[in-house]
Amino acid sequence: MRLSRYFLPVLKETPAEAQIVSHRLMLRAGMIKQASAGIYSWLPLGYKVLRRIEEIVHEEQQRAGHIPMLMPTLQSADLWRESGRYDDYGQEMLRITDRHGRDMLYGPTNEELITDIFRSNVGSYKDLPLTLYHIQWKFRDEVRPRFGVMRGREFLMKDGYNFDLTKEAALHAYNRHLVSYLRSYERMGLQAIPMRADGGPIGGDYTHEFLVLAETGESEVFYDAEITDLSFGDRQIDYDDVGQCQAVLEEFTSRYARTDETHDPDAFAKVPEARRRSARGIEVGQIFYFGTKYSDAMGATVIDKDQNQVPVHMGSHGIGVSRLLGAIIEASHDDKGIIWPEGVTPFHCGIVNLKQGDAAADAACEGLYDALTKAGLEPLYDDRNERAGGKFATMDLIGLPWRITVGPRGLKAGVVELTSRKTGESEELSPEAAVAKVVARYAGA
């Protein structure tokens, strides 16, 4: 993409309403624009990152054997009355009446709807196990939306639902989700720690939240510092292997890590004092096992091998897709702007022409642009007739992992400058070597 033809409305000044780093930088980098309180339009740069995150989530869910689908944003209130949650959910749920006087709601979650789909179409234990998921916009009428996409009223979320014949099978589904979430977050450049949490309005007595440690986090968390040394890495997982998935769960949850709702001071005191930590965390996902809560209430049953009609065991599993953008920025930025991890960057590399209109510089930039594009990457070429300082400031603000700078002086020596946004280190390379190094960084991604 050529910046002269792109829509990137960057701001020089920080809007007064932005209270935290991610909100400030998303507004300044032209990623979002507020439409109303807690509701945002996603401008091209922000939308590209959103799609990158969606792609990772889809890939990892399907790697785990989960089946994608799509449910509507509007739901019938009758289903929620059936489960008993219509009145329990409170004012966060936006209630709507259509022209025929039917009560509807803008779904804050989908347990009732997916249970209705299941009970209408599945009747035998032979159809189990089954895990369905979707990525859809949701709405919760927050009293005081703030912090940009971190606590908005409208947000994009992946939620998945497993249906199993037994508790043991449902807990294996729980473990599969934990593994797939760990893989997803690491691909996004995040360390998200699974912590024992409270079930809230969704319910269930077994649940983990995934939290990214950050000073701006809304949750207070308590944990054993050893857990921050864990990494999923590039290990291979057989999602059908019960023991292997259970081992990952035990590895990542055996140390003390809890949110404030479930914090146990006596248990925490058993952690060696030097390893005890308290901090703030940003919730970016949560997994639940809630047994037969919804299947009992809504009649989601199957015939087992002994011809008995039994309720299915269920779980619900969510990732805050739009919130992840804010969490990534909170975890990866400096005083100049965003520092995108390579897995979610909107463009793979920036190209800065220091002297637009110079024949040699223009030709070299076009050559770099073509070479990167042919290699399957998406470069952003700043071909505007602007001063160099302004071009550098824009590139630093939007945070692309790599920048190739081209100028007449360097070209006379046969080199361009390749700069890492993360480290700030630069090196002079031939144009061909610069392209090769950038391409190698994304090989296999």
Curated annotation (Swiss-Prot):
It is found in: Cytoplasm. GO terms for molecular function: ATP binding; proline-tRNA ligase activity. It catalyses: tRNA(Pro) + L-proline + ATP = L-prolyl-tRNA(Pro) + AMP + diphosphate. The keyword RNA-binding does not apply. Its EC number is 6.1.1.15. One of its GO terms (biological process) is prolyl-tRNA aminoacylation. One of its GO terms (cellular component) is cytosol. CDD domains: ProRS_anticodon_short, ProRS_core_prok. Keywords: Aminoacyl-tRNA synthetase, ATP-binding, Cytoplasm, Ligase, Nucleotide-binding, Protein biosynthesis. It is an enzyme of class 6 (ligase). Homodimer. Belongs to the class-II aminoacyl-tRNA synthetase family. ProS type 2 subfamily. NCBIfam families: PRK12325.1. Catalyzes the attachment of proline to tRNA(Pro) in a two-step reaction: proline is first activated by ATP to form Pro-AMP and then transferred to the acceptor end of tRNA(Pro). This is Proline--tRNA ligase. The lineage of its organism: Bacteria, Pseudomonadati, Pseudomonadota, Alphaproteobacteria, Rhodobacterales. The gene is proS.
